[in-house]
């Protein structure tokens, strides 16, 4: 059984995904900018919405569950959202 990832590890996984997405979008050099990272995240979430629709999944329910996980995880480690 593997240990649960820490919140910094979770954030790093998200960053790695955004880097991969940025490379695909040819905007890797701009990823350091908070504005560009936010745009990439927005684009990625929109793509996930398309994926969810294609699979007949409730995207908003997934977001709600993700928010509950985030709140529980930040509470566990004493992080501030």
What is the predicted role of each segment?
Residues 58, 65-75:
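Amphipathic alpha-helical binding modules
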Residues 20-24, 47, 51, 55, ...:
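Surface-exposed polar/charged interaction patches
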Residues 1-39:
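N-terminal acidic leader/helix
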Residues 36-64:
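An amphipathic alpha-helical micro-motif enriched in hydrophobic residues
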Residues 1-5, 71-81:
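Short intrinsically disordered terminal tails
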